[in-house]
């Protein structure tokens, strides 16, 4: 019996050590996240570059969807929520509609969406970058304006995706300094 108790203790210790190793790996990936961010943003910009011309030629509107108040929310105390809501907005509302307007660019849009999902996953894993609860009025305004534009909203939102990437970058620079 003492031998089996010792065996159980060793198994328990091995399990604890393995779970500690997992936490360390997660903590390590969060420690390295800021260094990898420029690469992730470059990948987002490159993926967007593959569809940008299509949406620029289709966007016939002079107004701006992603305006200065959105950037201010990204830089302010609502930055976390603005980022989270905008990622969700692009993934759930804009990109699925965009695929319908340009089947020839569907593969590139899927790639862009996957890169955005990867960024969201990494932000959520590293809680200090995305710990939020409040709603952003600027994001609500973007969504409202998008819906008012109907079919043209997709072209406008996708044409301004680079502005969204710049907002992500501004938010992350602020978070990395704090």
Swiss-Prot record:
GO terms for molecular function: cytokine activity. It is found in: Secreted. Residues 1-18 form the signal peptide. PROSITE patterns: INTERLEUKIN_10. It comes from the Eukaryota. Keywords: Cytokine, Disulfide bond, Glycoprotein, Secreted, Signal. Its main location: secreted. One of its GO terms (biological process) is negative regulation of inflammatory response. Glycans are attached at residues 67, 134. Disulfide bonds join 30-126, 80-132. One of its GO terms (cellular component) is extracellular space. Belongs to the IL-10 family. Homodimer. Interacts with IL10RA and IL10RB. This is Interleukin-10. The gene is IL10.
């Amino acid at each position: 019996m003492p031998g089996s108790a010792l065996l159980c203790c060793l198994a328990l210790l091995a399990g604890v050590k393995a779970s500690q190793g997992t936490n360390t790996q997660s903590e390590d990936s969060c420690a390295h996240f800021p260094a990898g961010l420029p690469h992730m943003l470059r990948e987002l910009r490159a993926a967007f570059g593959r569809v940008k011309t299509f949406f620029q030629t289709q966007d016939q509107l002079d107004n701006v969807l992603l305006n200065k108040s959105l950037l201010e929310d990204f830089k302010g105390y609502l930055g976390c929520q603005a980022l989270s809501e905008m990622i969700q907005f692009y993934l759930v509302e804009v990109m699925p509609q965009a695929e319908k307007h340009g089947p020839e660019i569907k593969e590139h849009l899927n790639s862009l969406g996957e890169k955005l999902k990867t960024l969201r996953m990494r932000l959520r894993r590293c809680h200090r970058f995305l710990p939020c609860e409040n709603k952003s009025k600027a994001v609500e305004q973007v969504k409202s304006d998008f819906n008012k534009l109907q079919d043209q909203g997709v072209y406008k939102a996708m044409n301004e995706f680079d502005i969204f990437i710049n907002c992500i970058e501004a938010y992350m620079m602020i978070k990395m300094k704090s």
